[in-house]
């Protein structure tokens, strides 16, 4: 069952390891045609895809770097604004403290002035009431003294002018004795 080709090949005496020159030519032409198609059509398409991908990656990296730079600039701007806001808040707080201290000082001054005014009014009113009470007391003491003296003497001492002089003189003497007693 040996095939006829094998028998012929054995008969011719050709080496089976060395291919036929026509086969080599067909394989070389086929390979060259395949390489031409690959180089002419497939490689440019692959190269274009590769280049597009490289450009997309580089563009993405450039966009990322640009976005990072913008983010850094925005962050620096934000930090600057935040520092300015903190400075402004501190200034406003200090202004408010100063204003509050001024308001408290003014209120304290007004309260002190009002208290002094009320105290002086009260002192003046007390002095006026004391004088009024002293004058009324002198009149009542004089009237009682005249009535009592009239009862002791047994006659009426109703002469107003004369009795008033006596009472005034008595009260003046009494005031002098009290002043002298206080001075001692």
Curated annotation (Swiss-Prot):
Location of this chain's protein in the cell: Cell membrane
GO cellular component: plasma membrane; proton-transporting ATP synthase complex
Coiled-coil intervals, chain numbering: none
Pfam family, one: ATP-synt_B
Superkingdom of the organism of origin: Bacteria
Transmembrane segments: 24-44
UniProt GO molecular function: proton-transporting ATP synthase activity, rotational mechanism; proton-transporting ATPase activity, rotational mechanism
Keyword annotations: ATP synthesis, Cell membrane, CF(0), Hydrogen ion transport, Ion transport, Membrane, Transmembrane, Transmembrane helix, Transport
InterPro entries linked: ATP_synth_B-like_membr_sf, ATP_synth_b/b'su_bac/chlpt, ATP_synth_F0_bsu_bac, ATP_synthase_B_chain
Membrane-topology descriptor: Single-pass membrane protein
Function per UniProt: F(1)F(0) ATP synthase produces ATP from ADP in the presence of a proton or sodium gradient. F-type ATPases consist of two structural domains, F(1) containing the extramembraneous catalytic core and F(0) containing the membrane proton channel, linked together by a central stalk and a peripheral stalk. During catalysis, ATP synthesis in the catalytic domain of F(1) is coupled via a rotary mechanism of the central stalk subunits to proton translocation. Component of the F(0) channel, it forms part of the peripheral stalk, linking F(1) to F(0).
Binding partners and assembly: F-type ATPases have 2 components, F(1) - the catalytic core - and F(0) - the membrane proton channel. F(1) has five subunits: alpha(3), beta(3), gamma(1), delta(1), epsilon(1). F(0) has three main subunits: a(1), b(2) and c(10-14). The alpha and beta chains form an alternating ring which encloses part of the gamma chain. F(1) is attached to F(0) by a central stalk formed by the gamma and epsilon chains, while a peripheral stalk is formed by the delta and b chains.
PANTHER family (alphabetical): ATP SYNTHASE SUBUNIT B (PTHR33445:SF1), ATP SYNTHASE SUBUNIT B', CHLOROPLASTIC (PTHR33445)
Family: Belongs to the ATPase B chain family.
Name of the protein: ATP synthase subunit b
Organism name: Micrococcus luteus (strain ATCC 4698 / DSM 20030 / JCM 1464 / CCM 169 / CCUG 5858 / IAM 1056 / NBRC 3333 / NCIMB 9278 / NCTC 2665 / VKM Ac-2230) (Micrococcus lysodeikticus)
């Amino acid at each position: 069952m040996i095939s006829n080709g094998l028998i012929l090949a054995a008969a011719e005496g050709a080496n089976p390891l060395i291919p036929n020159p026509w086969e080599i030519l067909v394989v070389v032409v086929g390979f060259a045609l395949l390489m031409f198609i690959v180089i002419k059509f497939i490689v440019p398409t692959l190269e274009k895809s590769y280049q597009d991908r490289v450009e997309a990656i580089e563009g993405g990296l450039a966009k990322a770097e640009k976005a990072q730079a913008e983010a850094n600039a925005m962050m620096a701007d934000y930090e600057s604004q935040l520092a300015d806001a903190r400075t402004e808040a501190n200034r406003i707080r200090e202004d408010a403290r100063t204003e509050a201290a001024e308001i408290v000082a003014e209120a304290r001054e007004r309260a002190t002035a009002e208290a002094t005014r009320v105290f002086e009014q009260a002192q003046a009113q007390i002095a006026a009431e004391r004088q009024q009470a002293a004058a009324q007391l002198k009149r009542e003491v004089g009237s009682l003294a005249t009535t009592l003296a009239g009862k002791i003497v047994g006659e009426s001492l109703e002469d107003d002018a004369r009795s008033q002089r006596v009472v005034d003189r008595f009260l003046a003497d009494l005031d002098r004795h009290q002043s002298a007693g206080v001075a001692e």
